[in-house]
């Protein structure tokens, strides 16, 4: 199978940098696109990104730039920005000339807003002719950067595209599986952050290991509920057993290295919850996703008790 000649990663945060490291270990021509000039110089000359990844050394062949005018020349462009910035990022890349010749791999997890919809649906409007894939898995940024073993699912409506991306990214420490179920992979990637908030709350309440295990079971049911109404799991539910769904869900819910689990835990133990929510500065994707998932629950009249419970505490309850 053919290799991509060169690969771009757009997004210089913790996940973007660590994902670029994964790709650079398997491909020679990899460039990280970012905005911060200080971090750019650090990556180029010291091969670190201390702000996001501490003193972890990045691959020596990893290049970096702030010059978006050249991104159109890359065969594969990996998008690794927060969900709230996703649509603006795609619109920006369009102004720099990306075309149907560029394959996109979306590593962002969440929904597009105004209106609330899957990222794939928004991409169908913004870039209808581009080959598109989606990546999700149990991938904590610092562990990726350290080259510790993990796995990921890669989805595309064109299985040949998914397989080509997987072929380019896979290594002994980064294994992949492929699927055409782009809907379930996206739904799981967005909802797992909400479930992780619930996991953190339960941990603070000392609910025990049994309760957290049952949370995983209930979470998979709610992923199934939303996925099916959005067009996922039309033939089977095997995708639930893959790295990008149950693997990512378990990691996010069980690790305090997860920002969402940490947020849920700290929220629950805080004495002044209004103040906590008002002053919490770290990006929590689950908190952002809540507002959007509630729109979908209302639109399709869905029963999703975990999401509704977390929303009643965090988003639409007395703590707003």
Swiss-Prot record:
GO cellular component: cytosol
Database matches in Pfam families: NAD_Gly3P_dh_C, NAD_Gly3P_dh_N
EC number(s) stated in the UniProt entry for this protein: 1.1.1.94
Residues binding NADPH: 14-15, 35, 109, 141, 259, 283, 285
Annotated localization: Cytoplasm
Record-annotated active site: 192
Molecular function GO labels: glycerol-3-phosphate dehydrogenase [NAD(P)+] activity; NAD binding
Pathway participation: Membrane lipid metabolism; glycerophospholipid metabolism
Catalytic activity: sn-glycerol 3-phosphate + NAD(+) = dihydroxyacetone phosphate + NADH + H(+); sn-glycerol 3-phosphate + NADP(+) = dihydroxyacetone phosphate + NADPH + H(+)
GO biological process: carbohydrate metabolic process; glycerol-3-phosphate biosynthetic process; glycerol-3-phosphate catabolic process; glycerophospholipid metabolic process; phospholipid biosynthetic process
Binding site for sn-glycerol 3-phosphate: 109, 137, 192, 248, 258-260
Enzyme class: oxidoreductase
Keyword line: Cytoplasm, Lipid biosynthesis, Lipid metabolism, NAD, NADP, Nucleotide-binding, Oxidoreductase, Phospholipid biosynthesis, Phospholipid metabolism
Highest rank taxon of the organism: Bacteria
PANTHER family, per database record: GLYCEROL-3-PHOSPHATE DEHYDROGENASE, GLYCEROL-3-PHOSPHATE DEHYDROGENASE [NAD(+)] 2, CHLOROPLASTIC
Membership in a protein family: Belongs to the NAD-dependent glycerol-3-phosphate dehydrogenase family.
Functional description taken from the UniProt entry: Catalyzes the reduction of the glycolytic intermediate dihydroxyacetone phosphate (DHAP) to sn-glycerol 3-phosphate (G3P), the key precursor for phospholipid synthesis.
Annotated protein name in UniProt: Glycerol-3-phosphate dehydrogenase [NAD(P)+]
Source species: Rickettsia typhi (strain ATCC VR-144 / Wilmington)
